């Protein structure tokens, strides 16, 4: 519904930014690394995820598309809600992706609110899905490039 928000930071709270967007100010819950780098008066452009509950509308914001997609995957795991996913992302998106791919239960259980069973469930459910999310530090490869690279390698193997 709300794919993103751009505006000026009007307040930095303990777990959220207040972003001025036209005549509105919107509270956006964000991972701690994003909050640490935000300053009142600075411009932000956030990728967002809106969560609707019976008694609450919550907006979660991320600096890049990869962290947003990781957040969406994390909340798909039973036992991990939006606030828990933000706690996990506070460890850094790249570190979380690496932990899921390498099945590092110890890393995940070191995060507040994540027990051994939830960590194991997250690894089982997400280890294959996580490969489709490019880390924020590396650009996503275009599928055609991968197919082209494979074709070139095959031709070189045949002596062409």
Predicted regions and their residues:
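Structure-specific DNA junction-binding interface
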Residues: 1-76
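Signal for well-folded cores of large energy- and translation-related assemblies
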Residues: 10, 49, 75, 90-93, ...
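Mobile acidic interaction elements
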Residues: 62, 99, 110-111
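Glycine- and Gly-Pro-enriched alpha-helical subdomains that act as flexible
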Residues: 109-112, 122
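Strongly charged, low-complexity linkers/loops
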Residues: 122-160
């Amino acid at each position: 519904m709300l794919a993103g928000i751009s505006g000026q930071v009007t307040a930095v709270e303990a777990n959220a930014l207040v972003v001025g967007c036209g005549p509105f100010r919107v509270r956006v819950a964000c991972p701690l690394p994003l909050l640490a780098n935000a300053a009142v008066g600075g411009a932000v452009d956030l990728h967002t995820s809106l969560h609707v509950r019976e008694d609450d509308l919550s907006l979660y914001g991320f600096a890049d598309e990869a962290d947003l997609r990781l957040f969406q995957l994390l909340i798909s795991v039973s036992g991990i809600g939006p606030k828990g996913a933000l706690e996990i992302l506070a460890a850094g998106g790249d570190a979380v992706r690496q932990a899921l791919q390498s099945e590092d239960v110890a890393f995940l259980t070191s995060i507040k609110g994540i027990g051994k069973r939830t960590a194991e469930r997250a690894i089982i459910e997400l280890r294959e899905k996580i490969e489709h999310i490019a880390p924020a530090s590396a650009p996503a490869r275009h599928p055609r490039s991968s197919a082209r690279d494979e074709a070139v390698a095959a031709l070189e193997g045949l002596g062409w």
